[in-house]
């Protein structure tokens, strides 16, 4: 695999049945209207035969599934044309901790090291009636059929490409049933399906997995982009949320990034496109189980982004979902990195946003709920951070319209210019 791993939750009918009561939670009080997307970042991806690390004190579930492999660039693909964009399929295992809620992104449950084994790509034309088997230590443990998915492969590719450009090598995990197989250290997990080579991985106590030898991917053009929601108390109050007790972390896909003096598209028929000036922390060396006291040693430097959000698309599932935050070109970012040494205190910087020359947003990183060292320590506790990974630290309180010029700046780090255009102008 060489691309982004997208995955979909709540896509099996058994999940929809199991979560009916939860679907009535405020504020939406409805089941998901669209596919519920998430991302498996590069630290999760391993190949056949590599160990799945077992986190101490946790329950671990094997989620046998199949991955659609994108064969060519796909943007706004119609369902009936989807087959033209599919290079093939691969067996995969969406390893996860149990989830008690789908309200927030499941970073700690889904994005730990080695939590996404993927097998070899096979050039099959259709997997809409495929039985997927799981064996534990050579014995049958579970099976299910893809005909029970809420949305099939073609529908998922069409739905995702509506807002996110897919590139060759990107993958889409098609989902898992509600009931999955519990696994323990010492187990060998084998995923099988007709027409595919088996995908087999040992489960190993994470303390025995010292270093990741390799990723079965080509070098990434940039690292994983983590982003923070509600990390300024005034922004949380503006959105009528209590400040979180634990960081609200979500992931942004590579398609969302654009540069300085570029344009971002405001979708038609929406009301709430928010601009969000953010300080971005760039990781300089591999970090795993880093203490808060040592965390700044792993920072290479800083840059600036504008983390636009289309809040019209918020639902109750993995808020803020990919339709809100990972649309094409929705995250302008400066390409230059200011070295850590040039910023003595990243927690004493002024952030400003100007719209058409008018100051609309101003805040200070002194008001961060979770500091830079805390965020690095928090993330590295359950996943490996790699050089080039980035953490967008959140935004103070502060809508943008077609034709607006939006300038965001972070004191001492940089100034980023972006213009908002309509869907018609962008064509």
Curated annotation (Swiss-Prot):
The annotated subunit structure for this chain is: Monomer.
> EC number(s) for this protein?
5.3.3.10, 4.1.1.68
Per UniProt, which keywords does this protein have? Aromatic hydrocarbons catabolism, Calcium, Isomerase, Lyase, Magnesium, Metal-binding, Multifunctional enzyme, Repeat
Q: Which reaction does it catalyse?
A: (2E,4Z)-5-hydroxypenta-2,4-diene-1,2,5-tricarboxylate = (3E,5R)-5-carboxy-2-oxohept-3-enedioate; (3E,5R)-5-carboxy-2-oxohept-3-enedioate + H(+) = (4Z)-2-oxohept-4-enedioate + CO2
Where does the chain bind a divalent metal cation?
276, 278, 307
Give the metabolic or biological pathway: Aromatic compound metabolism; 4-hydroxyphenylacetate degradation; pyruvate and succinate semialdehyde from 4-hydroxyphenylacetate: step 4/7; Aromatic compound metabolism; 4-hydroxyphenylacetate degradation; pyruvate and succinate semialdehyde from 4-hydroxyphenylacetate: step 5/7
InterPro entries for the chain: Fumarylacetoacetase-like_C, Fumarylacetoacetase_C_sf, HPA_isomer/decarb_C, HPA_isomer/decarb_N
- An example Gene Ontology molecular-function term: 5-oxopent-3-ene-1,2,5-tricarboxylate decarboxylase activity
Instruction: Give the family, as the similarity comment puts it.
Output: Belongs to the FAH family.
Please give one Pfam family short name. Answer: FAA_hydrolase
Name it.
Answer: Homoprotocatechuate catabolism bifunctional isomerase/decarboxylase
Role noted for this protein: Decarboxylates OPET (5-oxo-pent-3-ene-1,2,5-tricarboxylic acid) into HHDD (2-hydroxy-hept-2,4-diene-1,7-dioate) and isomerizes it to OHED (2-oxo-hept-3-ene-1,7-dioate).
Please give the superkingdom of this protein's source. Answer: Bacteria
One biological process GO term for this chain? 4-hydroxyphenylacetate catabolic process
Indicate yes or no for the key word Lipid metabolism: no
Which coenzyme or cofactor does it need?
A: Mg(2+)
Q: List the PANTHER family.
A: 4-HYDROXYPHENYLACETATE CATABOLISM PROTEIN, ACYLPYRUVASE
Which species is the source of this protein?
Escherichia coli
Q: Where are the annotated Approximate repeats, by residue?
A: 1-202, 203-405
């Amino acid at each position: 695999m060489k691309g982004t791993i997208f995955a979909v939750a709540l896509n099996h009918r058994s999940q929809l049945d199991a979560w009916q009561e939860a679907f009535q939670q405020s504020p939406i009080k409805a089941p998901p209207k669209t596919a519920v997307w998430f991302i498996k970042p590069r630290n999760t991806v391993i190949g056949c035969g590599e160990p799945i690390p077992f986190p101490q004190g946790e329950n671990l579930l094997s989620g046998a599934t199949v991955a659609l492999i994108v064969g060519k660039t796909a943007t706004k693909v119609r369902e009936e044309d989807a087959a033209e964009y599919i290079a093939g399929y691969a067996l995969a295992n969406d390893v996860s901790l149990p989830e008690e809620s789908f309200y927030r992104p499941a970073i700690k449950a889904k994005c730990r090291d080695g939590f996404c084994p993927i097998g070899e790509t096979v050039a099959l034309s259709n997997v809409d009636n495929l039985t997927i088997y799981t064996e534990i230590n050579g014995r049958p443990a579970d099976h299910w059929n893809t005909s029970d998915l809420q949305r099939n492969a073609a529908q998922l590719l069409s739905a995702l490409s509506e807002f996110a450009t897919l590139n060759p090598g990107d993958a889409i995990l098609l989902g898992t049933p509600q009931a999955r197989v519990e696994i323990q250290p010492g187990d060998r997990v084998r995923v099988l399906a007709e027409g595919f080579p088996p995908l087999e991985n040992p489960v190993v106590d994470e303390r025995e997995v010292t270093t990741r030898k390799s990723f079965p991917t080509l070098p990434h053009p940039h690292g994983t982009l983590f982003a923070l929601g509600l990390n300024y108390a005034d922004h949380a109050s503006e959105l009528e949320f209590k400040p979180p007790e634990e960081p609200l972390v979500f992931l942004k896909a590579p398609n969302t990034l654009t540069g300085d003096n570029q344009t971002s598209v405001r979708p038609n028929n929406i009301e709430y496109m928010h601009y969000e000036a953010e300080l971005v922390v760039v990781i300089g060396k591999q970090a795993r189980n880093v203490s808060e006291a040592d965390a700044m040693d792993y920072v290479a430097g800083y840059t600036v982004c504008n983390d636009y959000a289309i809040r019209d698309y918020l639902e109750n599932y993995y808020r803020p979902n990919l339709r809100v935050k990972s649309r094409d070109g929705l995250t302008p970012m400066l390409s230059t990195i200011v070295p850590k040494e040039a910023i003595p205190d990243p927690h004493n910087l002024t952030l400003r946003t100007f719209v058409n020359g008018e100051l609309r947003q101003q805040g200070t990183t002194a008001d961060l709920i979770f500091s830079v060292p805390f965020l690095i320590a928090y993330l590295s506790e359950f996943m490996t951070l790699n050089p080039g990974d980035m953490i967008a630290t959140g935004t103070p309180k502060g809508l943008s319209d077609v034709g607006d010029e939006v300038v965001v700046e972070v004191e001492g780090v940089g100034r980023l210019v972006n213009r908002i255009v309509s869907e018609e102008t962008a064509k």
